[in-house]
Amino acid sequence: KAPKSEVKIIDTIKYINPIIDKVVIGSYLKSLKVSPFLYGKLYTYSEDDYTITNTISSKLIEAMTCKLLPLIRDFQPDILIATHSFSTEMLSVLKSKYNMNIPCMSIITDYYSHSSWLHPYIDAYVVSNEDMINKMIFKGISKDTIYNLGIPVKPEFNMNYDRGETLESLDLCESKFTILVMGGSLGLGKIVDIYKQLTNINEDIQIIIITGKNKKLYAELSKIKDSSSKETRIIGFTNHVNKYMQACDLLLTKPGGLTITEALICKIPLGLFSPIPGQEEKNAQFLLRHNLAVNLTDIEKCSENIEKLLHSKNELKNMIENCSKFSKPYAGDDIFDLINWLVQNKSDKSSFPKEEKIYEKNNPKTFFKSAEKYFLKTALKLFEL
């Protein structure tokens, strides 16, 4: 839409300090593996704005934000956009502490507005559904800054693919009920247990499983497939998830924000398993509340619950209709229009801090070094648990 525009995309924490990025990601993945319950408790606990955790986190983010200033000054952007809660808080710090009068937008990529996303100096919040708005207003966010435009996904999800051709390319039957199983690009969740349950269903179904980059999972499923009576196709990493979604009748998946959005656009009812405690559990609650999904977290009852759904054509039809109601296939276009409006009405490049001013406030050279050391020390302790 704007071929002459220049866009710079950065992984914020990685750009600031690759070591901190590795520790953060490593600690996050380890906490999910070792104690997902504890992670969920921390997520819930941090909803309170005044916890020790949030206070420490805010101070560290404030200290790290100064490292973005040279990049911003050199690039001279018309607008800053964040798609993560850390980055959103950094944008708020940039406006409040460094008086940068350029528009800042945050796109919340889940179906629940956790407090970690909500900060006072953001000009526009893009959300995925109406349910989020009242919570945000209660937390002090102005209604005038909240835009229910949806989560943007790849344009390919708006392209129509022929179900018959896709299934034929996999040597599957177009008339059979087709179930797609996914666990994200890493193939996470209890996919093996889910597949074993699917093989017990007393209906003529066929199964497609996408394992992403998880080669171990691919090999394990392939062994089970050899002794299964259900027609099954196992696919590794693919760039054609949209084609497979449009070819299936039911998607079994973890409730990640982007996967949910893609499924709603493709009008596919969902079966939810292995939600990450915290944000994915909140996503699941939204889907179940609006009859967009069935709950498969009790793996032992997975085949029973899917059979019930197969026997209720009206229920499936209602779920598909609900997907249409909550789908926002043109979110990307609508967000682009909002970006244009913000740039035209709120951008002031003269407010960029001068080079000599960048390191003056709070003596961030010294402050950042001490904060960085403290963060690494704290995160490494968590990583060692």
Regions found by a protein language model. Name each.
Residues 314-385:
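C-terminal amphipathic helix plus adjacent low-complexity
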Residues 246-256:
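Acidic donor-binding loop of glycosyltransferase active sites
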Residues 163-165, 172-248:
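Donor-nucleotide binding loops and adjacent catalytic segments primarily
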Residues 290, 298-314:
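C-terminal "capping" alpha-helix adjacent to the active site of nucleotide-linked donor transferases
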Residues 41-140, 148:
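Active-site and donor-binding regions of nucleotide-sugar-utilizing enzymes
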Residues 123-185, 214:
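A nucleotide-sugar donor-handling region in carbohydrate enzymes
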Residues 3-71:
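Conserved N-terminal ligand/cofactor-binding loop architecture of enzyme catalytic domains
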Residues 248-249, 267-269:
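A short alpha->beta transition loop at the rim of the catalytic pocket in nucleotide-sugar-dependent
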